[in-house]
Amino acid sequence: MIQQKVLFISLVAVTLGLGLGLGLKESVQPQAQSWSCSKLRCGEKRIANVLCSCSDDCLEKKDCCTDYKSICKGETSWLKDKCASSGATQCPAGFEQSPLILFSMDGFRAGYLENWDSLMPNINKLKTCGTHAKYMRAVYPTKTFVNHYTIATGLYPESHGIIDNNIYDVNLNLNFSLSSSTARNPAWWGGQPIWHTATYQGLKAATYFWPGSEVKINGSYPTIFKNYNKSIPFEARVTEVLKWLDLPKAKRPDFLTLYIEEPDTTGHKYGPVSGEIIKALQMADRTLGMLMEGLKQRNLHNCVNLILLADHGMEEISCDRLEYMANYFNNVDFFMYEGPAPRIRSKNVPKDFYTFDSEGIVKNLTCRKPKQYFKAYLSKDLPKRLHYANNIRIDKVNLMVDQQWMAVRDKKFTRCKGGTHGYDNEFKSMQAIFLAHGPGFNEKNEVTSFENIEVYNLMCDLLKLKPAPNNGTHGSLNHLLKNPFYTPSPAKEQSSPLSCPFGPVPSPDVSGCKCSSITELEKVNQRLNLNNQAKTESEAHNLPYGRPQVLQNHSKYCLLHQAKYISAYSQDILMPLWSSYTIYRSTSTSVPPSASDCLRLDVRIPAAQSQTCSNYQPDLTITPGFLYPPNFNSSNFEQYDALITSNIVPMFKGFTRLWNYFHTTLIPKYARERNGLNVISGPIFDYNYDGHFDSYDTIKQHVNNTKIPIPTHYFVVLTSCENQINTPLNCLGPLKVLSFILPHRPDNSESCADTSPENLWVEERIQIHTARVRDVELLTGLNFYSGLKQPLPETLQLKTFLPIFVNPVN
């Protein structure tokens, strides 16, 4: 980072020096000067074909240059004004509701502003005076059309259909690209963009370029829109947006978009670390300054709500960092979308679309070399945090490429200089800016990062609209707003727990279970017979933030209380929906006992509703795993509380390597680092990979010869106190969360780990599969943190937080 900063400072000096020498200052360029006033132009006679006027009647004619008042009338510029106070909100007559401007600067990575805000005085003032996030997370793939349309709809790409800048749809038998006329076919564009939400509810919307806005989606366009033309100067775009705000009330738009291609165009050509990027950033900054000056000239600078954001970031690339498919296949006989987010499909479509050997391609790209700069996935196996599987347009073969690398067909590929984007949205280089200013937003406010799927709901709130269904979590950005329009309501539990009373000891012959080390079976079983006081104490210890609520209809389950853990045992799937426990910094672990050595039926569960040990035969690839690790108990005798069939779940033998190391090594490590953890874990069933829990009818279709359904994933939610002086049980302030959705697969080929020790790969693997608590909720039908006393919007912030583990390359 220090080297980067030194390089940039040098580039700044060179750039500014060249600027002075080569006449880059606007005051020297007649064309640039025509967009602004000067003392010489003040009071000028009207001239034909001038881009804006500095004549004495320009205010009356509404064609003044945006800086007319500051240059010709001696008023202070917006840039030199102090930040508006909370009492300074003002709108001129005729503006009963604040207009909303959504301004996108393409490819403006958050790191540009983090490091070089002093070079961008207008953007820096917006950041200082308004609300800003350290960064906004783009959706995957981090491409232009994908993210702009997600911002407009609040939908993941798999939901709105624009899954990349280049797409093939087998049902339409059409190809989509940015330059093709087919991109204007409404069949590509799903969801309800914000301009339609506005017009459907009586407002007017105007778009000066936005992907999708020139398409007749659902039979209509925005009230006003412009067909894309990249040759139109940025100043002309700003001028037109300001003219829209000058329209009579009956015609004036309430929602407006503005888009500029910089710094993306320059980033692609020269890369994100270059003197040219500095010029592009300063050009973008001047464009914002022109807009704010124009708003102030209309007394709208404290009336309009403005959101300034980007679609994605930018990463440096090199022709020395390419992975060639020709090095993995003798004959590259398939179609490949090349670059930082590659996909592979059949060349012969639609004929071979469904019969293409996607699994064979992934297998041939997995663990082929000691060091590969990509991982190959079937779309259904991609990290759930990406939400990139549930659409026929998403090809089944996907490559997740390392930072600064690209995967391509062969050496004919030449677009490998400068910069690009499209990578994993957790990479720091892909992070985008988010700034907001206006009477609707809090002042001088920095907020934690969030995902761009949340912006649609935020815009609806500012415009007092009811959002269309979307993937955002409504209310999670209320802390950005001065007076939140929407108040979220707590989820309502759909299925309450049943009773599973302590019963007689069943015959061991029923289960096939054995445990020769138990000499006093009745005494061991009586430990499961907790009285009400003991249950209350267990809940205080093991469920400090409330019991996970079941939002699935007609779910039959009961709560099982033990001293050191609590579980919700499902009679539908014959395993726990969840298990919850709390461990401390000092919790010690030992080698977990083998279930085949000691396991017995839970006397609280009728035999007909219980798993049996005979379900697990030695020749099967499935083995019983524990949700609550028995070795977390403090004595061998207490371990018997967990060596019961109600605590086991079916796991592939290969997966138990990851699961056991996670629980015996990593969870205790995290507990030491965070002064204790509350742990909730359980199974996930998502066979149709739509990101939502499967119905029980669907689950039953995937019962194999073990007679129990096999989960597609397992989740783990680790919660601690943000103030690590406190343990999870005495935490009065904000909470901190780490959550994971781990694919349940028969092998560990994702990590090329069949022979590697667990300490070399398990932690990296689980970090790849980090997730939001909200993702876990959607996949399980559970509602977490129901017992928190804090306002619900604060809980929603916690649920939508995504941990980041990726170390930046630059």
Curated annotation (Swiss-Prot):
Record's subcellular location: Secreted
Tissue expression per record: Expressed by venom gland.
Q: Which residues form a coiled coil?
A: none
- List all disulphide bridges recorded for this chain: 37-42, 37-54, 42-72, 52-54, 52-65, 58-64, 65-72, 83-129, 91-303, 319-416, 367-752, 500-558, 513-613, 515-598, 721-731
Q: Where is the active site?
A: 144 (amp-threonine intermediate)
Task: Please share the entry's free-text remark on the cofactor.
Answer: Binds 2 divalent metal cations per subunit.
Q: Which residues bind a divalent metal cation 2 per the record? A: 106, 144, 311-312
Q: Which residues bind AMP?
A: 230, 268
Q: Which residues form the signal peptide?
A: 1-23
Provide this UniProt record's keywords sorted from A to Z.
Answer: Disulfide bond, Glycoprotein, Hemostasis impairing toxin, Hydrolase, Metal-binding, Platelet aggregation inhibiting toxin, Secreted, Signal, Toxin
Q: Name one GO molecular function term.
A: nucleic acid binding
Name the cofactor(s): a divalent metal cation
Which GO BP terms apply? nucleoside triphosphate catabolic process
User: Among the entry's GO cellular component annotations, what is one?
Assistant: extracellular region
Which intervals hold domain SMB? 33-77
Reactions that this protein is recorded to catalyse: ADP + H2O = AMP + phosphate + H(+)
Partners and quaternary state?
A: Monomer cleaved in two subunits; disulfide-linked. Is synthesized as a single-chain protein and is subsequently cleaved to form a two-subunit protein held together with disulfide bonds.
Function text: Hydrolyzes ADP with high activity. Shows weak or no activity on 5'-AMP, 5'-GMP, 3'-AMP, ATP, cAMP, and cGMP. Is devoid of monophosphatase and proteinase activities. Dose-dependently inhibits platelet aggregation induced by ADP (IC(50)=0.99 uM) and collagen (IC(50)=1.4 uM).
The name under which this protein is listed is: Venom phosphodiesterase 2
Q: Which organism is it from?
A: Crotalus adamanteus
**Source organism lineage?**
Eukaryota, Metazoa, Chordata, Craniata, Vertebrata
